[in-house]
Amino acid sequence: MPAPQKDGPRANRDIRGVREVQLIDETGQNRGVMGFFDALQVAEEAGLDLVEIAPNSTPPVCKLLDYGRYRFNEQKKQAEARKRQKTVEVKEIKLRPGIDKHDYDVKMKAVQRFFEEGDKVKVTLRFRGREMAHQDLGLRLLERVKAETQEIAKVESEPQLEGRQMIMILAPR
């Protein structure tokens, strides 16, 4: 049964099948090509670890550094990258065909805020009862939303009827 693979670069005696390495010291200076065991001895004398940085080059590039600190810094960088990464959410705005002007303006301000936050917006227009006979009013309303947001958003999904509601999805530019 093969030994389990560790994630991250190989260090010290985990580096196998290598006769010579290109050594970079702790200050970043190139120490040249030397035998693997000589490089390992230099690392032990300096109280540091020999870490394989570029395993695919010939000869492999190894660097003298504190492996524990190196792993810690790598984990911190990954955590910071995850923190900075924003997941795009789909926010929903619900409208009715007979919406008043003020209510419409309030909804449009919310749409604008969602785009500033980088979220997509799903505009849902719900028809009730006999409003289904006047789908053209609903389509005009969604076209108006599209026209007012064309500067800051692009249409990801054109208005389409699904059951008793018409749906359009907008994404920020």
Swiss-Prot record:
Signal peptide residue numbers: none
Transmembrane segments: none
Domain of life: Bacteria
GO BP annotations, alphabetical order: ribosome disassembly
Pfam families: IF3_C, IF3_N
Gene Ontology terms: cellular component: cytosol; membrane
GO molecular function, one term: translation initiation factor activity
HAMAP family hit by this protein: IF_3
Job of this protein: IF-3 binds to the 30S ribosomal subunit and shifts the equilibrium between 70S ribosomes and their 50S and 30S subunits in favor of the free subunits, thus enhancing the availability of 30S subunits on which protein synthesis initiation begins.
Family the UniProt entry places it in: Belongs to the IF-3 family.
Protein name per the record: Translation initiation factor IF-3
Organism whose genome encodes this protein: Methylobacterium sp. (strain 4-46)
